[in-house]
Amino acid sequence: MPIVLVRPTNRTRRLDSTGAGMGPSSHQQQESPLPTITHCAGCTTAWSPCSFNSSDMETPLQFQRGFFPEQPPPPPRSSHLHCQQQQQSQDKPCAPFAPLPHPHHHPHLAHQQPGSGGSSPCLRCNSCASSGAPAAGAGAGDNLSLLLRTSSPGGAFRTRTSSPLSGSSCCCCCSSRRGSQLNVSELTPSSHASALRQQYAQQPASASQYHQCHSLQPATSPTGSLGSLGSGPPLSHHHHHPHPAHHQHHQPQARRESNPFTEIAMSSCRYNGGVMRPLSNLSSSRRNLQEMDSEAQPLQPPASVVGGGGGASSPSAAAAASSSAPEIVVSKPEHNNSNNLALYGTGGGGSTGGGGGGSGHGSSSGTKSSKKKNQNIGYKLGHRRALFEKRKRLSDYALIFGMFGIVVMVIETELSWGAYDKASLYSLALKCLISLSTIILLGLIIVYHAREIQLFMVDNGADDWRIAMTYERIFFICLEILVCAIHPIPGNYTFTWTARLAFSYAPSTTTADVDIILSIPMFLRLYLIARVMLLHSKLFTDASSRSIGALNKINFNTRFVMKTLMTICPGTVLLVFSISLWIIAAWTVRACERYHDQQDVTSNFLGAMWLISITFLSIGYGDMVPNTYCGKGVCLLTGIMGAGCTALVVAVVARKLELTKAEKHVHNFMMDTQLTKRVKNAAANVLRETWLIYKNTKLVKKIDHAKVRKHQRKFLQAIHQLRSVKMEQRKLNDQANTLVDLAKTQNIMYDMISDLNERSEDFEKRIVTLETKLETLIGSIHALPGLISQTIRQQQRDFIETQMENYDKHVSYNAERSRSSSRRRRSSSTAPPTSSESS
């Protein structure tokens, strides 16, 4: 079914009855490029909820009480008893819109004149398109465009064309006031296939046509607010026959507590039975939605609009609906059910829309063809891991059935030799059991190789399985099937076996069973043990080890796993292999020799074990010799295996006796200390003997030649001892410089060189910084003369201006002073003479 992913964002805002935003995002309301839907008076109904609750809906769209706090809850007004019961049974209405008269109570509001869409005082909403045949035909072009989009930029649910909706309009609110506007730019309609199917089953076909959004339905049906999906005629509802089951079903759902802000952003339309799931990680929503958008397929509901007057379809309305229906893109469905197609193609009256069914079939084939092409790396890794687990499980089952067949074969062979013959029913039953286990084993092997081919296709991106079928793979598959198919056939079949006895060389002829030829090759099934060990190895299943191995070009196969086991626990591996080979070879020699061994020498199990042991160890006493070529061949293989195991034992013992690195370092340190002491002692002996020789030859009156020769011999011995100790010390130093120590020294030198390189790079960076600073300083120095000259000129200009101002002041002062002196002289000349002057 199609999956619609919606990412909740902070862009979700409340909407009041006029379409204006409330809350923290109200300032974005004016910037929204999407138009608003204007509801006219004809689409207003009594107050009813629009909570799209359903039992199969994951995130229903519910409007809590108080979602529009600016409007007081209006009193319930309805002309029918059903409307009053519906209003009383709802605990949490979606939006308390003001009640207005119903269209069918006021025909002058519901039915308008054809062709008067342009002169209408209000814009016609989507719900008014199907009020009648004339109105639907004429008002199809007058409907306002409804844009459906999600909050994410690369959403997987969007409309590709913005066209008017006539018959298939989805109303987000089923009631409003006169002249109210509702912005649906942030809302996505929601519809449910299950609720629609229940409504189609419950509502009978009727000729009376009501408005799709105005019919009062039970609260559990989402079509009361959504209308029809364009797949049939509008449903007629009888107000005087309320269904009690609807109220009982709505009561537990209406009490569901939810956040209106989150639900508005996360609610989406489940077209064709789709399921909405919110994204768990917001950081990956853009990438996921873009991937889904590349695989999206358009789903268009068929244009089946039925007008009034007995349910006759209107051609003009159907044409307008088919031409103007929005193309809604839904994510790629995994399974297209016939019920989902029938939801769009079948109407309430039984009419089927062929266009919807054809569109669904085309989208189904398109999605199936593009499913494998658009698989991302996450899907491939998950599919590859699942194939790994299945292959490991198949290998385990194959080993179980293979070992079961071997055990039953051994039991049947031993019982038929001592308890009963091959013609008994017990032997037949055991052989039938062996055959059954062999058939199951062959089936498991075939399925195992099929899984390997699927893994090859996933790893190499191949589309056809024939690409993986190389001649080498086909040969090994056929060889494996042939090896596992060998088993004793039910029935008693014999042949004549002739051999020559060991010591008497007399011919021996006897009648042997064919089962001996078919039983011994069953031990070849033990190769399944190596496969199981490989698939269960930590080196093979761990992703980190496989990544490191791939970087180092290491192939993780059975050989590599056996090498690691021989490195980790060589003694255990050799012990298990030797004991298993010993027991199997001894039983095989017993089964081969029992038809020609009259003295019961090699046909005895203990005697056969002795023969295999001395052959395995390459001793060969000669007291026991096989008579048949079968026994001789088993002894030959045992001798070869014994030589190899003996060499491995010697290598393992030598490795165990070898000193470890720490032990070598301790041993070298102790030997170096001892050699240092010996060098000191030898040097002291040389000095002592030299002194004694000097004393006995120079400091005595009578020279004792015997004593002098004795000290000379000791002196020569001390020199020789000193030289030998120094040679041993030099050899010890050479032995200490092993490959591991050289590697360690190389690592130390590499670290030193790396440190020097880092220091040189740091030094170069500092030099570059210093050069940059020097260049800046040189530029500043070059610009200094200009700055100095400019400063001098400015200071000179200021000085001149100051001097000019002082000069002007001085001149004005002198002029003022001269004027004042002349004024005083003039006043003194014009003054009358005094009495003293006159006398």
Curated annotation (Swiss-Prot):
Instruction: Give me the ranges of the annotated region Calmodulin-binding.
Output: 672-748
* Region (Disordered), start-end ranges: 1-33, 64-115, 195-258, 280-375, 810-839
| Recorded catalytic activity of this chain's protein | K(+)(in) = K(+)(out)
Q: Where is the composition biased (Basic residues)?
A: 236-253
Membrane topology per record = Multi-pass membrane protein
**Residue intervals passing through the bilayer:** 398-418, 428-448, 474-494, 516-536, 565-585, 634-654
Question: What ranges does the record list as Basic and acidic residues composition bias?
Answer: 810-819
GO MF annotations, alphabetized: calmodulin binding; monoatomic ion channel activity; small conductance calcium-activated potassium channel activity
Query: Which terms under GO biological process does the entry name?
Result: membrane repolarization during atrial cardiac muscle cell action potential; modulation of chemical synaptic transmission; monoatomic ion transport; potassium ion transmembrane transport; potassium ion transport
Entry keywords, A to Z: Calmodulin-binding, Cytoplasm, Ion channel, Ion transport, Membrane, Phosphoprotein, Transmembrane, Transmembrane helix, Transport
Localization recorded for this chain is:
Membrane; Cytoplasm, Myofibril, Sarcomere, Z line
The annotated modulation of its activity is: Inhibited by bee venom neurotoxin apamin. Inhibited by UCL 1684 and tetraethylammonium (TEA).
- The Gly residues compositionally biased stretches are 345-363
According to the UniProt entry, which residue ranges have a biased composition of type Low complexity?
Answer: 198-212, 219-235, 313-326, 828-839
Q: What is its main location?
A: membrane
Q: Write down which residues bear the modification named Phosphotyrosine.
A: Y420
Which Pfam families does the UniProt entry name for this protein?
A: CaMBD, Ion_trans_2, SK_channel
UniProt intramembrane annotation? 605-625
Q: Report the GO terms under cellular component.
A: dendritic spine; glutamatergic synapse; plasma membrane; postsynaptic membrane; sarcolemma; smooth endoplasmic reticulum; T-tubule; Z disc
Tissue specificity, please?
Expressed in atrial and ventricular myocytes with higher levels in atrial myocytes (at protein level). Highly expressed in brain, liver and colon with low levels in kidney and testis. In colon, detected in smooth muscle cells.
Family, per entry: Belongs to the potassium channel KCNN family. KCa2.2/KCNN2 subfamily.
Record function comment? Small conductance calcium-activated potassium channel that mediates the voltage-independent transmembrane transfer of potassium across the cell membrane through a constitutive interaction with calmodulin which binds the intracellular calcium allowing its opening. The current is characterized by a voltage-independent activation, an intracellular calcium concentration increase-dependent activation and a single-channel conductance of about 3 picosiemens.
Q: What is known of its domains?
A: The calmodulin-binding domain (CaMBD) forms an elongated dimer with a calmodulin molecule bound at each end; each calmodulin wraps around three alpha-helices, two from one CaMBD subunit and one from the other. The coiled-coil domaim mediates heteromeic assembly.
Assembly with partners or alone: Homodimer. Heteromultimer with KCNN1 and KCNN3. The complex is composed of 4 channel subunits each of which binds to a calmodulin subunit which regulates the channel activity through calcium-binding. Interacts (via N-terminal domain) with MPP2.
Q: From the Swiss-Prot or TrEMBL record, give the protein name.
A: Small conductance calcium-activated potassium channel protein 2
